[in-house]
Amino acid sequence: MSEVLPLITRRGDRIAFVSGLRTPFARQATAYHGVPAIELGKLVTSELLVRTGIDPELIELLVFGQVVQMPEAPNIAREIVLGTGMSVHTDAYSVSRACATSFQAVANVAESIMAGTVEVGIAGGADSSSVLPIGVSKALARTLVDMNKARTLGQKLRLLSGLRPKDLLPVAPAVAEYSTGLRMGDTAEQMAKTYGITREEQDELAHRSHKLAAQAWESGVLRDEVMTAYVPPYEKALSEDNNVRHDSAIEQYSRLRPAFDRRHGTVTAANSTPLTDGAAAVLMMSESKAKSLGLTPLGYLRSYAFSAIGVQRDMLLGPAYASPLALARAGVALADLTLIDMHEAFAAQTLANLKLFASDEFARNQLGRNAALGEVDRAKFNVLGGSIAYGHPFAATGARMITQTLNELRRRGGGLGLTTACAAGGLGAAMVLEVTP
């Protein structure tokens, strides 16, 4: 549906974000090496509760996501509830929408508040690319199942004798789309070629992302929304994202070779977001509940939308499909926005989506609209940098973007912000946020 859809409770309350927090993000196998996503989720949720001063018993619902799931704890949300002092009666369930996972968590909490089933909830996500579910081959997995049913030692030995040495090798998690076999970087290369995105344009966007993120850290504007993380073995603390290049220089980017299409490609490690560990969460409640608790909301959820497209080509166009829906449901136009924050999975993907925002042909042929959303004012776009600089713990990125946008809107005296992301599987997400003066 594309008509205006006010997000209010049955009592007429808006959906309020009271607080948001994240851990510093760390590149794979660095500061959080060996720390599972569950522990990162507990860490950020505990600190969020402490900082807001809210009684943990008041939390009625926690919706959390994890993209790289661990088999031993498939419901990360419930483990966070049990490990952070909330009531054992607090409902909790996990969601996964690839890179848009915490957008989904926020939408689910919002829907529960609108339905009147809860008044207070936490949404977020955590991921670790350093603690991975290492699997076994299909042959070994089948043999282990059969051995469990074997009755005698002889039967078990006969089963084992059918294995080959290669069957005993560990199997790393897949980095490609299940349905196509394409890696995300392969899709980014497709998009660069389809939409004529040059290597120079990609490198410039990556440089801009790092430069603005470095300025944000140096100015101190991120301090209140990023906690200091102490993790085992508790020898060092991490207080800043360790992927941000404070000395980024544009000439450095041209030295890297293509990472996916080695001969003709333009997507490199430098103009892509790295594998990252981290967690982020937001505290949500009805507007009247916040008032009764004496809490001042950061801002409000004005609208949201999700989208899905084909996965064979250019599947990372989620922002171009979901954003028009979110804006229409909020009853606003692109020109009404104060800020636009788009997830930078790859510079090529980001630039392709920006092109389609301004394409009348795309609007008519793919969206059924009379005209394009419009050209994005770069002065409003990813003003604090983006995922290429901060990193991308898959399930945490949406909550980071929401908190960051709300805080920046407050610093600017209020306004409307669009946060939007692409996701694996041809999925997309967009949310319109509002901060009143």
Swiss-Prot record:
Primary location group: cytoplasm
Catalytic activity line of the entry: an acyl-CoA + acetyl-CoA = a 3-oxoacyl-CoA + CoA
Cross-referenced InterPro entries: 3-ketoacyl-CoA_Thiolase (IPR050521), Ac-CoA_C-AcTrfase_FadI (IPR012806), Thiolase (IPR002155), Thiolase-like (IPR016039), Thiolase_acyl_enz_int_AS (IPR020615), Thiolase_AS (IPR020610), Thiolase_C (IPR020617), Thiolase_CS (IPR020613)
Protein's cellular compartments: Cytoplasm
Biological pathway: Lipid metabolism; fatty acid beta-oxidation
Calcium found in the keyword field: no
Enzyme active site: C99 (acyl-thioester intermediate), H392 (proton acceptor), C422 (proton acceptor)
Group of enzyme by EC: transferase
Keywords: Acyltransferase, Cytoplasm, Fatty acid metabolism, Lipid degradation, Lipid metabolism, Transferase
Top-rank taxon, per record: Bacteria
Cross-referenced CDD domains: thiolase (cd00751)
Transmembrane intervals: none
Pfam family, one: Thiolase_N
EC numbers for this chain: 2.3.1.16
Reported function: Catalyzes the final step of fatty acid oxidation in which acetyl-CoA is released and the CoA ester of a fatty acid two carbons shorter is formed.
This protein's name: 3-ketoacyl-CoA thiolase
Native source species: Pectobacterium atrosepticum (strain SCRI 1043 / ATCC BAA-672) (Erwinia carotovora subsp. atroseptica)
Taxon lineage: Bacteria, Pseudomonadati, Pseudomonadota, Gammaproteobacteria, Enterobacterales
Name of the gene encoding the protein in the UniProt record: fadI
